[in-house]
Amino acid sequence: MTTIRIALAQINPKMGDFAGNTAQIIRAIEQARSHGADIVALPELAITGYPPEDLLLKPQFIAANLKALDEIVAASTGITAIVGFVDKTTDIHNAAAVIHDGVLKGVYHKTYLPNYGVFDDYRYFKAGETAPIFQWGDVLFGVNICEDIWYPGGPTQVQALAGAQIIINISASPYHSAKGGDRERMLATRAEDNAVALAYVNLVGGQDELVFDGDSLIFDERGRLIARGKVFEEDLIYADINTEKVFRERLHDPRRRQERIDVASEGMRAETIVLTEKYEAKARAKITSAIAPRLSEAEEVYKALVLGTRDYVRKNGFERVVIGLSGGVDSALVACIAADALGADKVRCVFMPTRYSSNESARDAASLARNLGVPYDVIAIEDTFKQYLEMLSPVFAGTTMGVAEENIQARIRGNILMALSNKFGALVLSTGNKSESSVGYCTLYGDMCGGLTVIKDVPKLLVYELCHYVNRRSAQPLIPEYIITRPPSAELREDQKDQDSLPPYEILDAILEMYVEQDMSIDAMIAEGYDEQTVRWVVRTVDLNEYKRRQAAPGIKVTTRAFGRDRRMPITNVYRG
């Protein structure tokens, strides 16, 4: 009987930080070795960070990554390590290095290269053509990368039919809401269908607009979960795999005897690479695998936003942020996220009232700042607003007050926030949500200014849900109740309400999900029971405001289809359908 201990290290690399990433990887290898692991796996492109985008077009970047791999190989004595890197042949490959006892024994090249959503693998990499399995004593295991395991056939099936008892998949799988459950079910199915133990290791951390959730998983040969890593945290998880159980399961599962696969048609060749002929059992205490708990949807999204904000700010060299508080839900939620991400002392909030700012907004903004313990300033902009109106009065003569005058206030606020940013080196966090940016209910060069739009991909109804979550988890509510219950308003004119300009958010968010995330047609949305005039207004307004969204700060992806990396539409476009 052979029992093999597998460790999965979900690390948080920094893009292009070869020294730092290499040190992280070596620390994980050393820790796994000290806990008696036979194999430790690290995520896809762990050496470079993911996704490197056009850094992959720089030969010197590829060379630096290979140099880092050499250092990792030398540090991997007494263990087998699987590490994601960029391999160079006549082309470049998204690759996994299989290192055994300080020697690079083999390399796997990713076969399925995704070219949808946020993925551009085909832009850079050449697909692999082999599906190697690795012999470790009497244990055979296969290695593949991320997308390779999302298909029922492909490398996983080829490797299993060639004798692999264990499949190790290294991934950089970006987060979106509810993806974790879908991914877990898929992986359990792969393990059960192929009668293999399956280990999946994922990146954790933020990279620009993407967040990686970790959530590494290990399943037994029946598809039962035996270990799960923490979500949105670095972690190192272990499991002991008994390959005799895999053999017994296969004896009792006649499906494998009937399976056939045309390897040539798949473009893959199965080959065996020997790591060691003999396995020497290690003396070690039995290990108990940890199964981290699943989170509620609200907690999951909130933690994704916290991690994405923390990493975006810190990895880009900032320590502090500044936020304009309006007394509304959006800026309140962003302030809570920022305080959790960076610490209250690193978050500066500013309230900038005019004649249209209500007493309730002033009260609630101050209460929120006090509850969070963040530095808080009030900078009145009424006099500046008056000066703008006076300066423009000759040019505006004969016209009525309207959107132009309203937006002057937002742009004054934007200027003040940017001045504070320049003076104190703090990153401005913009506070717009997905519903408003979808239909352009925001001011270009005003409330849109900033270095990161934290809730850019969060629909308005989800904003409210997250605010309730923030208050539920606290001994005392952090967000004043009136901020949540009052009708939303930009407060740029007398008695202004969002619903004066927009459909109710319950309707708007539903139509936006159908149009933006599902690409449903106008006719299909009307057939769902939505008012034709409202549907046509939403579609037209979304399309017309593409130019605004192109100029917005990046934001953290949490839905299945975010603006920017996911949804790529032309600005100049007259098609409505």
Regions found by a protein language model. Give the residues of each.
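Enzyme catalytic cores with a strong preference for nitrogen-chemistry domains
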Residues: 1-324, 340
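ATP/NTP-dependent adenylation/nucleotidyl-transfer catalytic domains that generate, transfer
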Residues: 195, 221, 245-326, 331-577
